[in-house]
Swiss-Prot record:
Family: Belongs to the anthranilate phosphoribosyltransferase family.
Source organism (scientific name): Sinorhizobium fredii (strain NBRC 101917 / NGR234)
UniProt-annotated binding residues for Mg(2+) 1: S93, E226
Cofactor requirement: Mg(2+)
Protein name: Anthranilate phosphoribosyltransferase
InterPro entries linked to this entry: Anthranilate_Pribosyl_Tfrase (IPR005940), Glycosyl_Trfase_fam3 (IPR000312), Glycosyl_Trfase_fam3_N_dom (IPR017459), Glycosyl_Trfase_fam3_N_dom_sf (IPR036320), Nuc_phospho_transferase (IPR035902)
Chain residues that bind anthranilate 2: R167
Length: 337
């Protein structure tokens, strides 16, 4: 079948799709066979009714089947947020990725330009001088030689061109905000995944377990798709096939609480300058929240045994200049492609 309308009708009637039906529906969308109106109607019907674990697993299957893969070490990690939280913060996962890479853990970062915020990872990295339009072999070289590589979602999920304009016109989060972090082209088994709403923490951990991930934290921090330093972060940890739920506070990391205003960013150039300032030694709320996310990532990767050790390793990566050097290597290697 090459017609999305029956699936639109089913979801509009508040029926859940099986994994097979969800995969079939997303195959139709990503093949270009659906119209923008059908795609918009389908995405919003899913959102209003609420996407199920099976629907997400099926959709990810369709995404992964069409993506352009990248080779990365077995122990590589991705630090990624769904976006769509509407908070307009600095590029926290981007800075955390550079800290983790500076600590010696390979990072295969998957991200995009901003859709529902002023600056996505790609916007900030582009302003810093990282070349984004490079092929899979060049990205693999970045991961090997720089310790960090950036996979620009549009290049690895070319079928997304069929939904991009509709997503921009809708201007709100859809299931695709959930699918991006679950469709890393390097096939990483270790991830820190931030989600835009607390109700998605546990379901996404289930999805990632069903998809074969090994060591995962899915987090939401008081309105942020990150571990937050403003209050409580809800966490679902996937390890050894089991899911454990718990909460963290800034005090869990030995950090003082901050306000959301202190974390507000701007456009790509503004956020790039703020990121560079932290790498150059500035201490502020942006540094603290990025260190917290890096510390958790170092635990997920098995590099740190607890958050205190993760914070110490992260601070050393900054103070020694190792995180800054990781960015410089990424700029150099990506531009040599």
């Amino acid at each position: 079948m090459n017609d999305l309308k029956p699936f639109v009708a089913k979801v509009a009637a508040r029926e859940a799709l099986s994994r097979e039906d969800a995969r079939a529906a997303f195959e139709i969308i990503m093949s270009g066979a659906a119209t923008p109106s059908q795609i918009g109607g389908f995405l919003m019907a899913l959102r209003v009714r609420g996407e199920t674990v099976d629907e997400i697993v099926g959709a990810v299957g369709a995404m992964r089947a069409r993506m352009l893969p990248v080779e990365a070490p077995e122990d590589a990690i991705d630090i990624v947020g769904t976006g769509g939280d509407g908070a307009g913060t600095y590029n926290i996962s981007t800075l955390a990725s550079l800290i983790v890479a500076g600590a010696g853990v390979p990072v295969a970062k998957h991200g995009n330009r901003a859709l529902s915020s002023k600056s996505g990872t790609a916007d900030a990295l582009s302003c810093l001088g990282v070349k984004l339009d490079i092929g899979p072999e060049a990205i693999a070289r970045c991961i090997r030689e720089a310790g960090v590589g950036f996979m620009f979602a549009q290049q690895h999920h070319s079928a997304m061109r069929h939904v991009g304009p509709t997503r921009v016109e809708l201007g709100t989060r859809t299931i695709f905000n959930l699918l991006g972090p679950l469709s890393n082209p390097a096939g990483v088994k270790r991830q820190l995944v931030g989600v835009f709403a607390p109700q998605w923490v546990d379901p996404l951990a289930e999805v990632l377990r069903d998809l074969g991930s090994e060591s995962i934290w899915v987090v939401h921090g008081e309105g942020l798709d990150e571990i937050t330093t403003t209050g409580v972060t809800k966490v679902a940890e996937l390890k050894d096939g089991k899911i454990r739920s718990f909460e963290l506070t800034p005090e869990s990391f030995g950090l003082a609480r901050t306000t959301l205003d202190a974390l507000k960013g701007g456009d790509g150039a503004h956020n790039a300058a703020a990121l560079q300032a932290v790498l150059d030694g500035e201490e502020n709320a942006y540094r603290d929240i990025s260190l917290a996310n890096a510390a958790a990532s170092l635990m997920i990767a098995g590099r740190a045994t607890d958050l205190a050790e993760g914070m110490a390793i992260g601070r050393e990566a900054l103070s020694s200049g190792a995180a800054k050097a990781a960015l410089q290597r990424l700029i150099t290697v990506s531009n040599a492609a």
